Amino acid sequence: MRQDQYNQPISTTSEAAQDAYINGITRFLAADAGIDTTFQRAIAADDSFALPHLGLARFYQMRGRGADVAAPLARARALVADATPREQAQVNALGLLMEGKGPQAYAAIRAHLAEYPRDVMIAQTCMGVFGMIGFSGRRGREAEQLAFTSSLVPHLGDDWWFQSQHAFALLEVGRTAEAEPVIEQSLATNPRSGNGAHIRAHLYYENGEAEAGLRYIDEWRNGYSKEGLLHCHVSWHVALWALEQGDLAKMWSVLDADVAPGGAEAPPINIMTDTASLLYRAELAGHDVPAERWSAISDYAKQCFPKPGIAFADAHAALAHA
């Protein structure tokens, strides 16, 4: 039996499937482009291997392609009966999450990590602003997030992806001095990680280093595909710093090319929230925002989020509609 990059057994005998699956996980954790095609290569090499089907379904969910989730998830469930207990538990937990069964999924995820703390595809669900903790709305979630990442340090502390997430958890509770060496170590191992670069930008912001932050993230994104899951959002950071420094031409240029509908290639929640928030911040800074820009993002919000239910999206949609 083969293993993934975390030395966990995976149920395939195909070296090509193993290599492609490992590559898919790496791309997923780095918010890189080509996640779907890489998992599809693993499937092509061994269609009976359940986890690439699951990874593809999870990517579709993250990308906002909800209609595409069901088929690969069903295939993963059909195939995993003969796999290892860890793989079976991973399919169960992520399946609950993708079906919108949040409380059941969270219970399954925490139980899974108690037994398999190096299962990053499960740990990832509870990391960052959009994770199950950060997106929960619970009071004290920042401290809860740090407690969660801290519990995994003995198991994943030397991993570049985990280091980026632990650094962000430290930032969120104001422990910037502790976060800096952690994110620097992460980026030293994988300097092209979208998650790492994004969190490094947050550290620049928290330290009040606007010029250095803009220079860093603007240069970094030059080599980042627009298909990357975080391209829209790191571009938002560029536009926001350009606004702060009074470079309105750059702000509008980046917004139109890489953040707003028609320019960005990103999950709809990022396009809508980043565009609405940037327009609002421009107005707060005393700049005129043409009405047609607000109309365009209002129309996009109506199209992609026609019903309320996601508080983060709803608040930004309200800005767009105001």
Where are these regions (language model features)?
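TPR-adjacent "capping" and linker segments in tetratricopeptide-repeat scaffold/adaptor proteins
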Residues: 2-19, 76-87, 301-309
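"A position-specific structural signal for the A-helix of alpha-solenoid helical repeats
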Residues: 15, 22, 55, 87-95, ...
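Residue-level recognition of tetratricopeptide repeat
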Residues: 16, 47-52, 85, 117-122, ...
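Inter-helical turn/loop elements of alpha-helical hairpins
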Residues: 23-40, 44-103, 130-142, 207-210, ...
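Residue at a conserved register position within TPR or TPR-like alpha-solenoid repeats
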Residues: 27, 60, 96, 130-133, ...
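Alpha-helical repeat scaffolds
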Residues: 40, 68-80, 103-116, 139-154, ...
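Helix-coil-helix junctions within alpha-helical repeat/solenoid scaffolds
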Residues: 242-322
